[in-house]
Amino acid sequence: IAKHVDKWSRAAFLETRLNAELAQHDPLTGTKNRRVFDEHLLRLWPKAIEERRGIAILLIDVDHFKSYNDHYGHQAGDDALRRVAQAIQTFASRPLDVLARYGGEEFAAALHDVDEAQALQVAERMRRSVAELNIEHEGSRAFGCVTVSVGVAAINPTRDRTVQGVLQLADQGLYQAKLRGRNRIETMSDEQHKMLVTGVFSLATAKDGKRA
C-alpha cells in the first residue's frame, strides 16, 4: 500500500508541476505568457528602484505577419512564430530577464540592469538573428524574408514613474520602427518619457490602431 501511495504522490506532484508550467507559458512558442511577463515586471520594478538599476523593455513584432499567414497558411505562420521565439529567447535568458509572447505576433522582453546602449545591442542581436533564419516571405517586398521591428525603452525606474508609461514608450518606439520601414529598431529616450508623463508626448499608436 505504501508503494502505491508513494507512486500516486509522485504522479500528483508531477501533474501539479506540469499544470503550473503550462499556466506560465505560451502553448505555441514555449515562451512565458503575457500574464507572467506583467507580473514579473511589477516585481522587478521596485527592486530596480531600490538597487538603482536600469530596466529596458523591448517590444518585438513580426513584420507583415498577416500577409505571411494569408500566403503560406496558418500552420506555416505558427511554425514561423516558434522559430522567431527560439531565435530571440537566447538574448533574454539571464535570471532576472524575461521574454514572453505578448499577443499575436508580438513578443516582449524585460531586461534587468542594463542601460540604453546595452538594450540596443540586445535588440540588434534579436533583429539580426531573425533575419538570419531566412524564412521566405514573398509579402515582404523590401527584404524577402521574415523580419522583426523592435521598440526599445530603457530608463532608470523611480517612484514617480510607472510600468505602464515605459510600456507605452516601447510601443511608440515599435510604431516608429514600423513607420520608418520595418526590420529596424527605434528607441525612446528619458526625455521623451518626461514628455509622455506631462502630456506633451502624443502617442501615434492611438491613431494607428493595429500594426502589421
Predicted regions and their residues:
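Conserved nucleotide-binding and Mg2+-coordinating catalytic segments in signaling enzymes
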Residues: 20-39, 60-74, 82
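Juxtamembrane or sensor-core-proximal signal-transducing alpha helices
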Residues: 1-20
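Cell-envelope/extracellular polymer assembly enzymes that use nucleotide-activated donors
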Residues: 56, 149
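A short pre-motif secondary-structure segment
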Residues: 98-101
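Short regulatory alpha-helical coupling segments
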Residues: 20-21, 34-54, 85-94, 112
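Catalytic-core segments of nucleotide cyclases and related cyclic-nucleotide turnover enzymes
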Residues: 112, 116-124, 141, 155-211
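Alpha-helical scaffold within the catalytic cores of cyclic-nucleotide enzymes
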Residues: 85-89, 118-138, 169-171
